[in-house]
């Protein structure tokens, strides 16, 4: 299947951070659900811009497509690069307060993943990075931050 077929088959819609998604389980603005899950599809010409979650852990699971790089900057400024694919890591855990972003390094095709967030995802605990603020915190990662932030 190609990206368009997955988007149609799974009923995906545009995501605020880039790519396409569909909530599968657990959106809970009351904070009572233990977790939430989504399908998330990223195309070669898009990215998941740097963002972080407060008080929530996110786990990404590879399903199909091209390898996906996930860039993670911890609060101390240490950068880790994880590649989700059939040949590399099949899942990656992102801890609360870590800035992270994702892209398809080959710039072709798409990648379909599943994401689980615990406790359940709440938009009030989601923060999209401001490029200038991230550059002040982590100037050593300037090239990556400039490429993986939207503003």
Predicted regions and their residues:
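Non-catalytic, conserved peripheral segments adjacent to functional cores
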Residues: 1-92, 101, 108-110, 119-122, ...
């Amino acid at each position: 299947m190609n990206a368009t077929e997955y988007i149609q088959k799974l009923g995906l819609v545009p995501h605020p951070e880039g790519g396409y998604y569909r909530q599968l389980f657990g959106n809970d603005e009351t904070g009572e659900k233990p977790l939430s899950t989504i399908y998330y599809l990223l195309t070669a010409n898009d990215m998941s811009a740097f963002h972080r979650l407060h008080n929530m852990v996110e786990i990404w699971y590879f399903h199909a497509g091209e390898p996906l790089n996930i860039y993670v900057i911890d609060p101390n400024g240490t950068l880790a690069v994880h590649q989700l694919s059939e040949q590399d890591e099949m899942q990656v855990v992102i801890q609360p307060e870590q800035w992270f972003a994702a892209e398809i390094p080959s710039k072709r095709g798409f990648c379909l993943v599943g994401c689980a967030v615990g406790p359940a995802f709440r938009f009030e605990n989601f923060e999209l990075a401001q490029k200038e603020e991230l550059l002040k915190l982590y100037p050593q990662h300037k090239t990556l931050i400039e490429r993986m932030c939207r503003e």
